[in-house]
């Protein structure tokens, strides 16, 4: 399966060598951006069979339903019968999913399947190329009962209409930093529970040593609150997120030290004059990075920028704007949450050189 599936291109490497290679990727990206690399780079690697999030392709063939990832360099889908990366709870659900999807009128030729393993169990978002009819809903209900799935949601492929709930059997919940919330269907979560904790800790460790009561922190691309909620235990947080359902999940917690605003940062970035008022800016942008937003951060010149990256190439491009604006790279953490994939996570702290701004907020 490894030789055909396009998911794990580096499975021939042992895990220590893989982590060392990815640490080198991050270091090279930051050097290319114009920074000296700190001597002490912390690193963490998730164990196999721990990934709790899966985006899978579905194809109807003459033999039945195929569920898996695209084959290397192809649009063909490799049927996933085993996986060294995914959590066993996801892999073990695939046979029943194949059986049910084969009977659905909604799956004419193709579908997409997004599975999140939450504290409440599997949460499934099914996107199909044909409408969902009444008998399809009945079959999905039977599937949910068989696998004890709290919620199955559905939407049309490539349609502007939002998802709808097809089956709801029980409450859906996930605990983030000690706070229980309900993520929307298909919500972005860090790939594993272990890496979520590691990223949260790396960001908290990257905060200035003393954050006083007057310190202000702006968080960009907040999602459901993976970073907002633990940061809110340390200081006042102004969180921005462009996806309203994710922001609604964060708001539902009602954490008084976290205020949140819905804003598409790729189309309407926070301006430099506002960012410059913050003592710390934390951002966790999408895979493509945050070119326009980074330009405003460089103009605003907040004292500290903590950047969480899942793409070394985008990190290099974005960080180069900080290098040109006079920032120094102080700390780097590498988190390998994408085992045997070229992708890796990194948490970097940048400090503005020769800051003349008062740091009373950081010490009182």
Where are these regions (language model features)?
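A short interface-forming secondary-structure element
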Residues: 83, 125-134
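Nucleotide donor/acceptor-binding cores
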Residues: 52, 122, 214-215
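A short glycine-rich, hydrophobically flanked beta-strand micro-motif that places a catalytic Asp/Glu
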Residues: 40, 108-117, 152-153
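Rossmann-like S-adenosyl-L-methionine
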Residues: 131-364
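Carbohydrate-binding surface patches
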Residues: 115-129
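Short beta-strand micro-motifs enriched in acidic
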Residues: 57-61, 116-118, 351-353
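Extended interfacial segments that mediate partner engagement and assembly in macromolecular machines
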Residues: 2-110
């Amino acid at each position: 399966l490894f030789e055909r599936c396009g998911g794990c291109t580096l499975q021939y490497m042992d895990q220590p060598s893989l982590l060392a290679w990815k640490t080198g990727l991050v270091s090279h990206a930051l050097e290319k951006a114009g920074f000296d690399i700190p001597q002490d780079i912390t690193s963490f690697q998730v164990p196999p069979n721990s990934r709790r999030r899966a985006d899978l392709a579905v194809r109807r063939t003459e033999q039945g339903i195929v569920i898996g990832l695209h084959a290397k360099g192809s649009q063909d889908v490799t049927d996933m019968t085993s996986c060294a990366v995914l959590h066993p709870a996801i892999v073990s659900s695939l046979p029943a999913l194949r059986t049910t999807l084969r009977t659905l009128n909604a799956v004419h030729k193709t579908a997409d399947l997004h599975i999140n393993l939450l504290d409440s169990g599997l949460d499934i978002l099914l996107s199909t190329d044909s409408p969902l009819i009444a008998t399809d809903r009945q079959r999905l209900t039977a599937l949910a009962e068989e696998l004890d799935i709290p919620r199955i949601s559905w939407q049309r492929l490539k349609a502007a209409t939002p998802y709808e709930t097809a089956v709801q059997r029980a409450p859906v919940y996930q605990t983030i930093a000690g706070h229980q919330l309900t993520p929307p269907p298909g919500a972005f979560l860090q790939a594993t529970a272990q890496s979520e904790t590691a990223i949260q800790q790396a960001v908290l460790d990257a905060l200035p040593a003393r954050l006083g009561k007057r310190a202000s922190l702006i968080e960009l691309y907040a999602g459901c609150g993976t970073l907002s909620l633990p940061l809110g235990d340390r200081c006042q947080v102004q969180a921005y997120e462009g996806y309203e359902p994710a922001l609604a999940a964060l708001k539902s917690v009602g954490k008084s030290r976290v205020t949140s605003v819905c804003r598409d940062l790729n189309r309407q970035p926070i301006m430099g004059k506002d960012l410059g008022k913050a003592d710390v800016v934390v951002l966790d942008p999408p895979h493509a990075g945050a070119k326009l937003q980074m330009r405003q951060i460089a103009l605003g010149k907040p004292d500290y920028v903590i950047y969480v990256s899942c793409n070394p190439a985008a990190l290099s491009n974005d960080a180069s704007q900080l290098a040109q604006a006079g920032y120094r790279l102080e700390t780097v953490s590498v988190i390998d949450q994408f085992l045997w994939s070229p992708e890796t996570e990194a948490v970097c702290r940048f400090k503005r050189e020769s800051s003349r701004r008062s740091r009373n907020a950081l010490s009182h």
